[in-house]
Amino acid sequence: MLGLRLIVGLGNPGSEYIKTRHNAGFRFVDGLVQREGQCWALESKLFAYVARVFIAGQWVWLLRPVTFMNLSGKSICAGLNFWKIKPEQMLVAHDELDFPPGAVRLKFDGGHGGQNGLRDITKLLGHGRFHRLRVGIGHPGHKDRVVSWVLGCPTCDENIAIDAALERASVVLPLAVAGDFDGAMKKLHTVV
């Protein structure tokens, strides 16, 4: 299988959203940029901030859309086309209501599961054949509270759990970049 060449973090732009649960994907790519000592650069034709990091002997593009979550596909499709990267070589990091804070899973292919960023990406691509990093943020318990939940800030304990999950995901990233998704999934999904 082809290795990763593009890692996208989903979230909403703007200072009022920085620390919200919905921005778990931004937190992941921001952590990679910081860890690798890189900086984001605004690329207006891609509707995103972009950076490059060197992982497992490969240069990998990072993309952080400046569009709102439900319009993420525009930026992602622009990046895929500009860099001539196949969707199968892309990892999209996003918040996941179905997992508690601290849980994180890799997945390939599938639907959007109600996640509006994924909904837009799959609509514009015409399929869901790309990798996802599903970062648990928990569920408020009732569907009527979902919007305020995802746009709310995690508690201190939830933040600690989410940060630990993002760290575990970054540890397996070299395997995914090298194309060993089974190995990355096994390592990430195995609780020690």
Curated annotation (Swiss-Prot):
Catalytic reaction(s) noted: an N-acyl-L-alpha-aminoacyl-tRNA + H2O = an N-acyl-L-amino acid + a tRNA + H(+)
Keyword list, A-Z: Cytoplasm, Hydrolase, RNA-binding, tRNA-binding
Family, as annotated: Belongs to the PTH family.
Entry EC no(s): 3.1.1.29
InterPro entries recorded: Pept_tRNA_hydro, Pept_tRNA_hydro_CS, Pept_tRNA_hydro_sf
Keyword hit for tRNA processing: no
Gene3D superfamilies xrefs: Peptidyl-tRNA hydrolase
Recorded GO CC terms: cytoplasm
UniProt subunit comment: Monomer.
Localization per record: Cytoplasm
Protein role: Hydrolyzes ribosome-free peptidyl-tRNAs (with 1 or more amino acids incorporated), which drop off the ribosome during protein synthesis, or as a result of ribosome stalling. Catalyzes the release of premature peptidyl moieties from peptidyl-tRNA molecules trapped in stalled 50S ribosomal subunits, and thus maintains levels of free tRNAs and 50S ribosomes.
CDD domains, alphabetized: PTH (cd00462)
Major localization class: cytoplasm
Catalytic site positions: 22
Site (Discriminates between blocked and unblocked aminoacyl-tRNA): 12
Any one GO biological process: protein quality control for misfolded or incompletely synthesized proteins
GO MF terms held by the record: peptidyl-tRNA hydrolase activity; tRNA binding
Site (Stabilizes the basic form of H active site to accept a proton): 95
Organism: Xylella fastidiosa (strain Temecula1 / ATCC 700964)
Any Pfam family matching the protein: Pept_tRNA_hydro
Amino acids binding tRNA: 17, 68, 70, 116
Protein name as it appears in the record: Peptidyl-tRNA hydrolase
